[in-house]
């Protein structure tokens, strides 16, 4: 059976523009909070295939999105490379021993050996393939090497990225060694997600905006493209989505390149600019400002505006970043219904 989301990724004719939301399996859903409480904490939920599959499916049933995205976290990758991960209340993700020296990097597990440790992710995918409706796509994902490296070097989330940037400008060879090690693990990780059954993969570069545009290709984009092209060569039938957040200047300068299918547009990049620079080569995904979900009127206005720019094929509706925890569920449902309404073909 044809999956509308996969068809849209390949610019095929669809009855309407499909829609999903980043972080759609999340804290805005009371049903998600119930399952998370059952798991005990966020990491336990990621490590429990049965419960992770349950929360992955919830947004399809409750909100009506056209695709499911695997419930997991980007930081399971460095965790299985040997960096102990904790989620501390009020602080978010924290690694107990950030990378400071060559010895720290050498101590980590690399390549396929690290990817093989993520069995709970592949098990979740296998459960989902049994339970998802045949017309609904399952999206697998990873963090981009740069975004993963920021946590691995800083030890936690950061507003300044000073340790990463100090390394970027004073010891770029070492930063490239870290990025190479992470890239090699991610390639195997994505391959194993595809082998387990995902229909689409997305690479999230959440902290792309931390890099100045003239350095973005060198320290992030080229590694993302390497992963995408490795996957496209082996699995041409699997769409690859790139989502680098906050790189409007990079887009405007015409610097985006690579063999992938869909470009995720963040809410800070005008959709008209993305269409002008990228729309002929790539399907575009996005890009409503997530805070518009607090108002149904603001949501409808934005959805209609995006539809007016994007028209028919070559587009997937989404937010320009993740849905926030205090958004009313009825407003998320309204967003999905409006996307499907305005794009429905006669």
From Swiss-Prot:
Q: Which InterPro entries match?
A: UROD/MetE-like_sf, Uroporphyrinogen_deCO2ase_HemE, Uroporphyrinogen_deCOase
Q: Does the keyword Lyase apply?
A: yes
Cellular component (GO) terms are: cytosol
| GO biological process terms on file | protoporphyrinogen IX biosynthetic process from glutamate
Q: Where in the cell is it found?
A: Cytoplasm
Question: CDD domains per the record?
Answer: URO-D
Which region is the signal sequence? Answer: none
Q: PROSITE patterns given for it?
A: UROD_1 (PS00906), UROD_2 (PS00907)
Q: Where is this site: Transition state stabilizer?
A: 73
Please give the family membership noted in the entry. Answer: Belongs to the uroporphyrinogen decarboxylase family.
- Provide the protein name: Uroporphyrinogen decarboxylase
Q: Which organism is it from?
A: Aliarcobacter butzleri (strain RM4018) (Arcobacter butzleri)
């Amino acid at each position: 059976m044809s999956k509308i989301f996969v068809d849209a990724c390949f610019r095929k004719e669809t009855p309407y523009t499909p829609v999903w939301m980043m972080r759609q399996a999340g804290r805005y859903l009371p049903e998600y909070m119930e399952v998370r409480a059952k798991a005990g904490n966020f990491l336990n939920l990621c490590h429990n295939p049965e419960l992770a599959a349950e929360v992955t499916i919830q947004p399809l049933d409750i909100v009506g999105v056209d695709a499911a995205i695997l419930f997991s976290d980007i930081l399971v990758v460095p965790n299985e490379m040997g960096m102990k991960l904790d989620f501390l209340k009020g602080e978010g993700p924290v690694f107990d021993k950030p990378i400071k020296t060559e010895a720290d990097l050498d101590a980590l597990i690399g390549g396929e050996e690290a990817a093989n440790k993520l069995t709970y992710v592949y098990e979740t995918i296998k459960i989902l393939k049994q339970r998802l409706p045949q017309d609904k796509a399952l999206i697998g994902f990873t963090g981009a090497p740069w975004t993963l490296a920021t946590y691995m070097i800083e030890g936690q989330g950061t507003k300044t990225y000073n340790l990463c940037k100090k390394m970027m400008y004073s010891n770029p060879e070492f930063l490239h060694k870290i990025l190479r090690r992470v890239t090699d693990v991610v390639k195997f990780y994505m391959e194993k997600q595809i082998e387990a059954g995902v229909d689409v993969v997305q690479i999230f570069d959440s902290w792309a905006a931390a890099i100045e545009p003239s350095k973005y290709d060198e320290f992030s984009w080229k590694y993302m493209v390497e992963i995408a092209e490795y996957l496209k060569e082996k699995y041409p039938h699997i769409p690859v989505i790139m989502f680098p957040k906050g790189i409007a200047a990079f887009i405007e300068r015409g610097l985006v390149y690579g063999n992938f299918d869909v470009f995720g547009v963040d809410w800070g990049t005008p959709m008209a600019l993305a269409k002008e620079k990228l729309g002929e080569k790539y399907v575009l995904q996005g890009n409503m400002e997530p805070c518009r979900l607090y108002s149904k009127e603001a949501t409808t206005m934005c959805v209609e505006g995006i539809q007016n720019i994007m028209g028919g094929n070559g587009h997937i509706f989404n937010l320009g970043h993740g849905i926030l925890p205090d958004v009313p569920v009825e407003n998320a449902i309204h967003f999905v219904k409006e996307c499907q309404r305005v794009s429905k073909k006669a």
